[in-house]
Amino acid sequence: MRISIITATYNSEKTLFDTLLSLEKQTHPDIEYIVVDGASKDNTIKLIKSNSTKVSKIICEPDKGIYDALNKGIQAASGDVIGFLHSDDLLAYDDAIADIAKTF
C-alpha cells in the first residue's frame, strides 16, 4: 500500500531537518513524500535537497497559505492513503507509517 505524506513549508529551515529525519527513519517500504514550499526566502529548499532521500516531489511556488499548499500536495499525490506531516512535526516512532498502513 502506497502512503503519500505531504509537508507544506515556508521559511522552515529551522524546524524542517527533524521532520525530514523522522520521515527518513520510517520502515514502510512504499512512501511517496511530497514537499510543497511556498517560495521560501531562506534555505528550506537547499535543506530538503541535501537531507532527504525519500522526497519524491518538491513543488516550489507561491501559494495562498497552508491550505492552498496542502491542496497542491493532494493533487500531486498518488498514494492509497494521504497524510500530512507539518514542517515542525515529527513521526513518533520508526514504524508509525507502517502501522497506519496496517489499519487499511
What is the predicted role of each segment?
Residues M1-S4, E32:
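Cell-envelope/extracellular polymer assembly enzymes that use nucleotide-activated donors
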Residues G38, L85-S87:
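Active-site acidic Asp-centered loop
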Residues D37-K46:
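A conserved acidic beta->alpha catalytic loop
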Residues S12-K25:
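Short, well-formed alpha-helical segments that are part of the catalytic scaffolds
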Residues C60-A77:
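Glycine-rich, basic loop-to-helix element that forms the pyrophosphate-binding segment
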Residues I82:
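Short aromatic/hydrophobic "clamp" motif used to bind/position activated sugar donors
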